[in-house]
Amino acid sequence: MGGGFTAGVGMARSFQRENVTDKVVFGVMGDSTFFHSGMTGAAEIIYNNARMIPCVLDNRITGMTGHQENPGSGFTLMGEEAPMLNIEKIFETYGFAPVLTVDPQDLTAMKKTVDEAVAALNEGKHPAIVTRRPCLLIKRIKQNLGMCKVNADKCKSCKSCLKVGCPAISMENGKAFIDRTQCVGCTVCAQACPFDAIEKEEK
């Protein structure tokens, strides 16, 4: 854990040494990992002038090991309110700019943010990206996103929705099918469908 940034520094510096400019290195980690072992890696990016883009996937919880709180969640491990450390300000303090924040479930905004970060990198800057969307399993955050369904008449069986990697989506009778017991209504599949065959329905 935490190797997303440090390994990225090594790769980026290797590319720089060989004058490879057509590849961009992205270092990715979650918010919890950033706080416990990623901040030193972020410092290494600046210190070594590594041509890479650090990305923190902030879901406001420690999803990997059991939903423990972290310094960015606003609560201690005992559930008491605590100061909420700001990832963007930490990046800015290290010298990253621009620091871009985006909702990762908005695919258009996400692509625009990545393009903006790459453009800044090509200008010699040190951009950073923070994607922020609370985990749906956080009990204290009530999120009712409804769910999605497939309009079989519009579905062309192109399987673009399967590329999203959502466990709720499969193929049934030659058409895309969404398991209602697993769908959380994020609409990423609907955004990926080129035929508008996936529709949102409110709960």
Identify the role of each PLM range:
Residues 57-60, 104, 133-134, 174, ...:
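Short, ordered loop/turn segments at secondary-structure junctions
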Residues 80-82, 144-150, 177:
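Short, exposed beta-strand "edge-strand" segments with a Pro/Gly-rich flavor and a Y/T-containing core
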Residues 1-128, 140-141:
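Thiamine diphosphate
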Residues 5, 9, 23, 27, ...:
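Feature representing long, continuous alpha-helical segments
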Residues 156-177, 188-203:
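Iron-sulfur cluster-binding cysteine motifs and their immediate structural context
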Residues 86, 103-106, 151-156, 179:
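Poly-acidic low-complexity segments
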Residues 150-151, 174-185:
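Flexible gly/pro/ser-rich segments immediately N-terminal to CXXCH heme-c attachment motifs
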